[in-house]
Each structure stands twice: as structure tokens, then as C-alpha cells.
């Protein structure tokens, strides 16, 4: 792949030119461009009058000398209107069944078919062959067709269990469009004087036939790394477990992988990256319900697994647990001993905290974990003022279990050694101890493990920062991934400060 970053820059500039004058259609243009560059088909779902046909018309200008064909289907449409009329002369003089295809679908690089589901069986069957094999049977001859992009559109989905499902399955990219939402964009659209049918693309950016053919071969050379395949397989397994998940054919998975390869290729990379998998959200859904489900599952994959976020959090949890164990091993030395007040004949014994315990919030470790309020508890956080009042006056005492959530009611007492003991429902007790002094710092074992974890986090964040330069991925998805990584980083740094 020659000068990959220059190619990525060129495709970005080409897309920007195609997007001019089209408001809130950047994502649709970019994915249609990606489909055209990889020879795939697109289905646009949405109400009339939202620029579906204009999107397809624009894509013609991405290529030098590209021919376009567009047609509005009705129940009465005939194959002649789509694939060309029969040659009366050939039929009369030579008895040959031959269509005159000039100006029709078989000789167009960019094809737009509106209200696609109204097409009859004769059109659908020929269209399936054209999409699958890029061939058209014209009489006795089988002709290769130059179609690079088929954009089909409708304001409805095909009926389930209908003859249309085979064609719908060939539409790899599926986009749900709506009218312009933003107020400023709506105003700009109303007042724009730009001729929507003018060519907005400079000749220097247009793609030649030679470039297109060469790129098709080079797209196939983009590798699929093992860790990316594992993410894809994880998504597939998760979808198989969900009762409401759409059926995704092996053919659709295979075609989707080529789309991911194209995304990597035109982003200047030699291998598919986890960020490319976000494109699957526009490939795997079938209807409105499955659209939301697919997006949710891919969101979980991207924010939890694609850059090892969940794995790093699991490692962090184990390190924190080990740190607490080490602290508990030292807890006998730091068991909290309260000070007894008053005489031995007082009606109720009163206590106070040692003078060296001054923090407004006290985190006390359990010498052995207890199950309190259905939670395995290793430490409890108390408000100093609440604990002092309980030591002085008795009554109810509450603390945050493991330092999280709301403060819970506790069974707390002072034993004969003047240590605080917390008990569970079976009255098993655990002595509360102060954590090691801050001056001691983190144990060497814990410090090293946290440093290694932080190093791994930096590597994953650097990988994401490098891979996120992808024209075809919406910015809001990238923002959520960045937030998930930053959250992991913040938790690691917090643990290092303990």
C-alpha cells in the first residue's frame, strides 16, 4: 500500500467535498463512499424528502467518468425500465433476445433504486444476480457489469418471511435516516442557494478506474489480527445467546469483514483495528428493535473489552484485594483501641477515640472479612463525628461497607480489650483496625503491580489514540471509548495514591 497516510487524507478530502450542502448526512455519505470503494450495497431507510436520492447522486462524482442510473420502483415497474428495452431489430432480424442496456442499470457504476420493496419478482431475481456476481444475462450472453455501488431506499422495511429477504440480506450497510434536526442546519438548508446537482469534487480528488481496480486487490491484503477476531467472535457468541437478536448469516459476516478491511485500508492502516468494528452497528441489524440491541452490544464490546478495559479493572480489583490482605496481616499492630472514660460504677461505659485519630472520615479494616447486608465486607468507612457520638452516648451506628453506597446500620461493640468489634447476623465478630500509616506508603509488591498495570493502560490508550483517526466512525462513539479508558486510568491512579 503506497503512501497510506496520503491516501487516507485524500479520501477524507473527497468525503468533505461530497458532503458540501448536505446537512446532517456526513455519516451516510461516508459509509456510502466506503461501500462504493469496496463494491458493497447500501439500504437507506427513512421518510420521503430527506435527500436519499441526492446522496446516491453525489457518489457518482467520487469517480472519474462514472455513469449513474436511478429509478423509482412501483408495483407496475417492468424489467425493461431497469435493465433496458428489448432490441426489436435483433429479435426481428436474428431472432436474438437482447436488451439495449445503454443508459440503464447494467452499464452504470452508481445505481439508486427508490421504493425498492415494490419491485416485482422478475426485477428482484435479476437484481440478485447483479449484486452477487456483478453479472447480467443479456440473452445468450453473460455480461460483466461495472456496478460499484447500489443504493436502495424505502420508507419501510421488507415484510418478514417474504420473498424480499434474500435481497435485503445483500444490503450490507443499513442506515436509518431522519429529517434535519438541528435548528442552525435547518436554516442553512432552507437558505442555501447551492445547486445540489453540481459536481462538488475537484478533478484531482476523483478516483480513476485504474485506482479503483488496484484498491480492490489491496483491500483483500489487509490482515485481521487475532485479538480483533476474538472480539468479533465474542460479539457473535453474545448475539447467539440473546433471544431477540437478529439472525446474521455467515455471508453477512464475511462481507462485513471486507468492509472492515476497507475501513482500515482507507484509514492508512495495514490491519483491521478494534475501532473498525463499530461499523458492524450499521451492518448487523434487521429492524428497529435489533438496531438498538446491536448498538448496545457493540457499545459494551468497545467500552469494556476492545482495549482491555474490563481486563484491566479485573486486575486492579485483584491488586486492591491483595493490598487489603497485606494490610489485614498488619492489622493486629494497628487495631483501633478506644479510651475508656468514667468510673467502673457508671450506668453506661463511655469511650473516646485516641487523640492521634483526627481524620474526618475513618476507614477501618476488618481483621477477617464478614458478610454484612449481603456483601462481603473487608473495610468500613465511618464519619468521625458519628463514631464519637456512638462511643459517648451509644445508640445506632452506621458505616459505608467497603466505602461505597449508603451508610448501613451495624452491630458494633467494644470488647474487653477496648477494641471495636463488628458482628454479622450470626454474631461472628471481626476486630476493626486502622490501616497502615500513610507514611509507610504502598508495599513494594503492590506498587510494582500498579506500575505494570498503568504501563499497560498507557499502551492501550496510545493504541486507541492512533486508531481513532478513522473517517468512517462517528465522534460520539470515539468519545465514549475515550471516557471508558479515562475511567480505568483514574481508578488506577486512585489506587496508587492509597
Swiss-Prot record:
Signal peptide from the UniProt entry: none
Catalytic activity: ATP + H2O = ADP + phosphate + H(+)
Regulation of catalytic or functional activity: ATPase activity is stimulated by ViaA.
Major localisation: cytoplasm
SMART domains: AAA
EC number: 3.6.1.-
Localisation per UniProt entry: Cytoplasm
UniProt keyword annotations, A-Z: ATP-binding, Chaperone, Cytoplasm, Hydrolase, Nucleotide-binding
Single GO MF annotation: ATP hydrolysis activity
Record-listed ADP binding positions: 23, 49-54, 196
A single Gene Ontology CC term: cytoplasm
Pfam families: AAA_lid_8, ATPase_RavA_C, bpMoxR, LARA_dom
Protein family: Belongs to the RavA family.
NCBIfam families: PRK13531.1
Role noted for this protein: Component of the RavA-ViaA chaperone complex, which may act on the membrane to optimize the function of some of the respiratory chains. RavA functions as an ATPase.
Quaternary state and interactors: Homohexamer. Interacts with ViaA.
Name used for this protein in its record: Regulatory ATPase RavA
Source organism of the structure: Escherichia coli O6:H1 (strain CFT073 / ATCC 700928 / UPEC)
Phylogenetic classification of the source organism: Bacteria, Pseudomonadati, Pseudomonadota, Gammaproteobacteria, Enterobacterales
Amino acid at each position: 500500500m503506497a503512501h497510506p497516510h496520503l491516501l487516507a487524507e485524500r479520501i477524507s478530502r473527497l468525503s468533505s467535498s461530497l458532503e458540501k450542502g448536505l446537512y446532517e448526512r456526513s455519516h451516510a455519505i461516508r459509509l456510502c463512499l466506503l461501500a462504493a470503494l469496496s463494491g458493497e450495497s447500501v439500504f437507506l431507510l427513512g421518510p420521503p424528502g430527506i435527500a436519499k436520492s441526492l446522496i446516491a447522486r453525489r457518489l457518482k462524482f467520487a469517480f472519474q467518468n462514472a455513469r449513474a442510473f436511478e429509478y423509482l420502483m412501483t408495483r407496475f415497474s417492468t424489467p425493461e425500465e431497469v435493465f433496458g428495452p428489448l432490441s426489436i431489430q435483433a429479435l426481428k432480424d436474428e431472432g436474438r433476445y437482447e436488451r439495449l442496456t445503454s443508459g440503464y442499470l447494467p452499464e452504470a457504476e452508481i445505481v439508486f433504486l427508490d421504493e425498492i420493496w415494490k419491485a416485482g419478482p422478475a426485477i428482484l431475481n435479476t437484481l440478485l444476480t447483479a449484486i452477487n456476481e456483478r453479472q447480467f444475462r443479456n440473452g445468450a450472453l453473460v455480461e460483466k457489469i461495472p456496478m460499484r455501488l447500489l443504493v436502495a431506499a424505502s420508507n419501510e422495511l421488507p415484510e418478514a418471511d417474504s420473498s424480499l429477504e434474500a435481497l435485503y440480506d445483500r444490503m450490507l450497510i443499513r442506515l436509518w435516516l431522519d429529517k434535519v434536526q438541528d435548528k442552525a442546519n435547518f436554516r442553512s438548508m432552507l437558505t442555501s442557494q447551492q445547486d445540489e446537482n453540481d459536481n462538488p469534487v475537484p478533478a484531482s480528488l476523483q478516483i480513476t478506474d485504474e485506482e479503483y481496480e488496484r484498491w480492490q486487490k489491496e483491500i483483500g491484503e489487509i490482515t485481521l489480527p487475532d485479538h480483533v477476531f476474538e472480539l468479533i467472535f465474542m460479539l457473535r457468541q453474545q448475539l447467539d445467546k440473546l433471544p431477540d437478536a437478529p439472525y446474521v448469516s455467515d455471508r453477512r459476516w464475511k462481507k462485513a469483514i471486507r468492509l472492515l478491511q476497507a475501513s482500515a485500508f482507507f484509514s492508512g492502516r495495514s490491519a483491521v483495528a478494534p475501532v473498525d468494528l463499530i461499523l458492524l452497528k450499521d451492518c448487523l441489524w434487521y429492524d428497529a428493535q435489533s438496531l438498538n440491541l446491536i448498538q448496545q452490544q457493540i457499545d459494551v464490546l468497545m467500552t469494556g473489552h476492545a482495549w482491555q478495559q474490563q481486563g484491566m479493572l479485573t486486575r486492579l480489583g485483584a491488586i486492591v484485594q491483595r493490598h487489603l490482605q497485606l494490610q489485614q496481616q498488619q492489622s493486629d499492630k494497628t487495631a483501633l483501641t478506644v479510651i475508656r472514660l468514667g468510673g467502673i460504677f457508671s450506668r453506661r461505659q463511655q469511650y473516646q477515640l485516641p487523640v492521634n485519630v483526627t481524620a474526618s472520615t475513618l476507614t477501618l479494616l476488618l481483621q477477617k472479612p464478614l458478610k454484612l447486608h449481603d456483601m462481603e465486607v473487608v473495610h468500613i468507612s465511618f464519619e468521625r463525628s458519628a463514631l464519637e457520638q456512638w462511643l459517648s452516648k451509644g445508640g445506632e451506628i452506621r458505616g459505608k461497607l467497603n466505602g461505597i453506597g449508603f451508610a448501613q446500620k451495624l452491630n458494633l461493640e467494644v470488647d474487653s480489650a477496648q477494641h471495636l468489634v463488628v458482628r454479622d447476623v450470626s454474631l461472628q465478630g471481626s476486630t476493626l483496625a486502622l490501616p497502615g500509616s500513610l507514611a509507610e506508603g504502598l508495599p513494594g509488591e503492590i506498587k510494582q503491580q500498579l506500575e505494570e498495570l498503568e504501563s499497560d493502560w498507557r499502551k492501550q490508550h496510545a493504541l486507541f489514540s492512533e486508531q481513532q483517526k478513522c473517517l468512517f466512525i462517528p465522534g460520539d462513539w470515539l468519545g465514549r471509548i475515550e471516557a471508558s479508558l479515562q475511567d480505568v486510568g483514574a481508578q488506577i491512579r486512585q489506587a496508587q495514591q492509597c
